[in-house]
């Protein structure tokens, strides 16, 4: 997927440097300075520029087929957003949302925009390869994206009231065919909308369009004066010209576009925020911050005195008061002498000792110019920077510009170009901070000094247009980073009232390490446990480059604190085991394996503790039997004897010390040792105290023999270790009279895995212990008892579909512990990429739930494929070359397939397109197996899950 940006010319030259992005990730260009192209012509220009840059010798249509592309139009003069005009609207710094985790402390509008557009393009049919969007809006959605239909043009829209719609393009859809465009209107009046409402739905255009190659070529032909790729591009508007020519009954018919098919999609749960002007930047930020009012979901616990005050990368001596409203301070130093009121935007102000009192509506921007100079640009909160200086309607500093000039003895000739305020040379350049303070007072005071007018005339001056060209963006970004370095330790110190521990801590740790910033100290025991965990892992990440030993110690502390949180509840409730069997009785427990279909990983702490998890999985029997079995029987000698049938191993446990050795990974009997501890046979877990294990077993009435059978190869991906642990706990619960139900057994399995230090989530044990096909869900918090919702299993059992479900053992194995540790570390650090992927997985589980409820086999298969793609995106090791080779062999015959569990090997679950395709797969893989041990295993939905019985 390629990202193409249309930016202001000055930004193009240094974009990759100032954003720390790779040229391979973003292609940047700007529209020609000498002429306007419109959104349609600009799209053609951007595509052609990228084509010339990448493969100039290749035919344009062939080049178009190579990749999916996001085109973001982010050029323009930004007249009404002076604070960020030099760097472009898309690089506007946006404050971290107080209710969100994983955002970067220095995130920009571009960082927020891209994930949704990337998700849309990923979900689009292969024929839709080009997405066009605007750079001055932030669009978010609270619901999963719906399926995107095949069409030449697919447009997203939002429902809005008629007044809102009168300021936008509007898609009109016949009520009898609501998914198709009938025609498009630009800014229709409320009266016109009222007339059409009887027969049509009206959906506001949000400027996100997906185009097929056919539609792109049609747009290119309309944009070029001659043939595509030759001659100049004309002005052509994507929305008012191209858009209005589309539909069944277009408002502006065009024969050349009549054959294009169009689909309109409401963006369900969609929200639309403008960042194109100063007032919009502030109002949108306020609206976003206040989206979540439920205090349980607001991470930042401090209460701001004024919700419309935003400070970023700024050193501020005077704390904002209740009287400060609509204030934005960024990349600035405001000492004791600075006093703000309302509607003040302050950006780029270097360290100073000025005495400044800004009236309402007065804003200050300082722009680095050259190597040492600064351009001072005061302006008004609502200034449009449009119109002739002689026009009374043209305002500057929220007053008629003529009035402002008259007070200062400034004449039109001083400005050089007075036909347009944007081109007027108003803003002086100096490297003298004392001069700059005098000039600032001269710009904004009611009684400006004549002497300063002389100073103003004597200095080189730039217009707003000039500043977009002359700004030294590398200096600007360097200053921003220096300001940030001063504020980050303060954020960390004031963590209780700041966003520090909710941001992307991997990114934050990099900033601390690169700039040798003082790390925050260990948090005290009275701090929230999850915050202490974040603190330890943050310190580990920041120390990784300079002190590996200390880094590993901090990481171990984070995992230890996590274990403490999960096991605390189990330790509070002590067990009292007592013998409930006859001397010759055997307790026999057996469980199914599980295949996770969607949402795997969202059950893993700490993600599930922070967000709750959604997982859809199935319990399966293999080759006609439950594959995981445990036998427990009394022993006449007061010791514990563990046996494994499949491993051919045995161990005799006679002391508490031997029982404690459960956390050694690789030990064949770690699970029964930990299970016995949880059942009350280790001090700290039992209700009564004994001096030795032998004494406790004598009091219990017998020794214990535990025999394990796992009829599944190691590293299968079917949840073997977790389900075996649950099966042992189920057997011991019955044998020792503990009375645990299936839910308690699954919860204690989560605790057991933390004791083993293997980590892991809860879906494996719930998947095998609970029967059938189910959606499993938990809510945020350390109590991770899952709620199960069962679905029909007919898709897996009816004769025409049962053969389509194939389970194939690949013979390739991979241990999950190291995979888990890496991804869990990303969860601890609020890694932006990890959290975004996990959020998608969680929503995807609900799509899978719906498909199973609807018994939609075709959709189910495609959703299994999407699950596999999500797993690969989260962990590249999920799909090693040998597995990818297998995927290539079966792909044409499958709707979807995936490796259950963490991936990398084990079993492959396949959903064949039909029984004939399933037969072809069996023939192919039986004739040419992937490895010597590779084989098909018969799978059947388990109707019982965990069963426990006695002889």
Over which residues does each language-model region extend?
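Left-handed beta-helix
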Residues: 2-7, 34-58, 137-138, 153-154, ...
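Conserved core of the sugar-phosphate nucleotidyltransferase
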Residues: 64-66, 85-88, 92-228
């Amino acid at each position: 997927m390629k990202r193409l940006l249309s930016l202001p010319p000055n930004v193009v030259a240094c974009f990759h440097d100032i954003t720390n992005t790779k040229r391979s990730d973003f292609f940047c260009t700007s529209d020609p300075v000498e002429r306007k192209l419109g959104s349609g012509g600009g799209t053609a220009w951007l595509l052609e520029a990228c084509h010339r840059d990448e493969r100039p010798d290749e035919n344009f249509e062939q080049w178009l087929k190579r990749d999916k592309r996001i085109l973001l139009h982010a050029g323009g003069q930004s007249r009404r957003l002076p604070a960020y005009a030099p760097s472009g609207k898309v690089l506007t710094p946006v404050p971290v949302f107080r209710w969100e985790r994983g955002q970067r402390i220095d995130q920009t509008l571009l960082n927020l925009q891209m994930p949704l557009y990337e998700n849309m393009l990923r979900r689009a049919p292969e024929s839709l390869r080009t997405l066009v969007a605007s750079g001055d809006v932030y669009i978010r959605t609270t619901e999963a994206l719906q399926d995107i239909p095949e069409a030449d043009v697919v447009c997203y829209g939002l429902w809005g009231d008629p007044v809102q719609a009168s300021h936008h393009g509007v898609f009109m859809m016949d009520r009898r065919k609501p998914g198709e465009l009938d025609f498009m209107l630009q800014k229709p009046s409320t009266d016109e909308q009222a007339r059409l409402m009887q027969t049509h739905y009206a959906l506001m255009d949000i400027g996100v369009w997906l185009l097929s190659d056919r539609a792109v070529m049609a747009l290119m032909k309309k944009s070029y004066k001659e043939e595509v790729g030759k001659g100049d591009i004309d002005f052509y508007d994507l929305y008012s010209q191209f858009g209005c020519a589309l539909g069944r009954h277009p408002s502006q018919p065009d024969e050349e576009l009549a054959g294009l098919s169009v689909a309109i999609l409401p963006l369900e749960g969609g929200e639309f925020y403008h960042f194109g002007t100063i007032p919009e930047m502030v109002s949108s930020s306020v609206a976003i911050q206040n989206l979540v009012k439920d205090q349980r979901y607001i991470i930042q616990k401090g209460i701001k005195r004024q919700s419309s005050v935003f400070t970023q990368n700024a050193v501020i001596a005077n704390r904002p008061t209740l009287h400060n409203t609509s204030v934005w301070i960024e990349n600035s130093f405001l000492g004791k002498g600075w006093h703000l009121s309302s509607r003040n935007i302050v950006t780029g102000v270097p360290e100073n000792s000025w005495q400044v009192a800004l009236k309402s509506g007065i804003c200050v921007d300082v722009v680095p110019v050259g190597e040492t100079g600064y351009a001072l640009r005061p302006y008004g909160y609502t200034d449009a920077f449009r119109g002739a200086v002689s026009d009374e309607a043209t305002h500057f500093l929220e007053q008629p510009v003529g009035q402002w000039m008259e007070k200062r003895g400034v004449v039109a000739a001083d400005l050089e170009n007075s036909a347009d305020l944007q081109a007027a040379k108003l803003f002086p350049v100096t490297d003298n901070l004392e001069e700059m303070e005098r000039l600032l007072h001269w710009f904004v005071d009611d009684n400006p000094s004549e002497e300063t007018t002389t100073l103003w005339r004597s200095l080189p001056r730039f217009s707003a247009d000039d500043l977009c060209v002359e700004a030294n963006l590398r200096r600007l970004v360097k200053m921003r980073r220096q300001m940030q370095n001063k504020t980050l330790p303060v954020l960390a110190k004031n963590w209780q009232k700041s966003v520090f521990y909710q941001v992307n801590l991997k990114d934050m740790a990099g900033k601390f390490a690169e700039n040798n910033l003082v790390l925050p100290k260990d948090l005290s025991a009275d701090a929230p446990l999850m915050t202490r965990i974040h603190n330890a892992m943050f310190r580990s990440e920041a120390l990784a480059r300079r002190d590996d030993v200390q880094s590993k110690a901090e990481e171990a502390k984070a995992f230890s604190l996590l274990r403490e949180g999960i096991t605390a509840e189990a330790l509070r409730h002590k067990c009292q085991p007592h013998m409930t069997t006859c001397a010759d009785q055997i307790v026999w427990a057996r469980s199914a394996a599980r295949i996770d279909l969607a949402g795997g990983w969202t059950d893993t702490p700490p993600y599930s503790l922070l967000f709750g998890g959604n997982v859809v999985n199935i319990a399966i029997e293999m080759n006609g039997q439950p594959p995981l079995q445990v036998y427990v029987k009394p022993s006449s000698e007061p010791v514990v004897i563990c046996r494994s049938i499949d491993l051919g191993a045995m161990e005799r446990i006679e002391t508490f010390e031997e029982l404690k050795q459960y956390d050694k990974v690789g030990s064949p009997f770690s699970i029964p040792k930990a299970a016995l501890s949880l059942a009350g046979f280790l001090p700290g877990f039992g209700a009564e105290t004994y001096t030795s294990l032998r004494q406790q077993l004598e009091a219990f009435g017998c020794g214990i023999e535990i025999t394990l059978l796992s009829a599944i190869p190691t590293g299968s991906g079917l949840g073997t270790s977790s389900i075996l642990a649950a099966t042992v706990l189920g057997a011991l619960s019955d044998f020792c009279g503990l009375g645990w139900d299936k839910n308690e057994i699954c919860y204690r399995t989560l605790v057991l895995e933390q004791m083993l230090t293997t980590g892991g989530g809860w879906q494996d044990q719930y998947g095998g212990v609970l029967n059938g096909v189910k959606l499993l869900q938990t809510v945020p918090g350390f109590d991770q008892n899952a709620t199960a919702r069962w679905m029909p299993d007919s898709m897996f059992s009816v004769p025409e579909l049962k053969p389509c479900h194939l389970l194939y053992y690949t013979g390739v194995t991979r241990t999950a512990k190291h995979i888990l540790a890496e991804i869990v570390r990303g969860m601890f650090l609020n890694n932006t990429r990890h959290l975004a992927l996990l959020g998608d997985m969680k929503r995807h589980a609900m799509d899978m739930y719906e498909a199973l409820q609807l018994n939609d086999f075709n959709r189910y298969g495609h959703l299994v494929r999407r699950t596999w793609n999500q797993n690969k995106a989260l962990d590249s090791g999920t799909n090693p070359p040998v597995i990818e080779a297998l995927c290539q062999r079966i792909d044409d015959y499958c709707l979807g397939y995936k490796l259950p569990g963490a991936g990398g090997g084990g079993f492959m679950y396949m959903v064949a397109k039909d029984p004939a395709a399933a037969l072809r797969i069996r023939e192919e893989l039986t004739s040419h197996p992937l490895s010597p041990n590779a084989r098909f295993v018969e799978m059947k939905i388990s109707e019982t899950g965990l069963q426990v019985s006695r002889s």
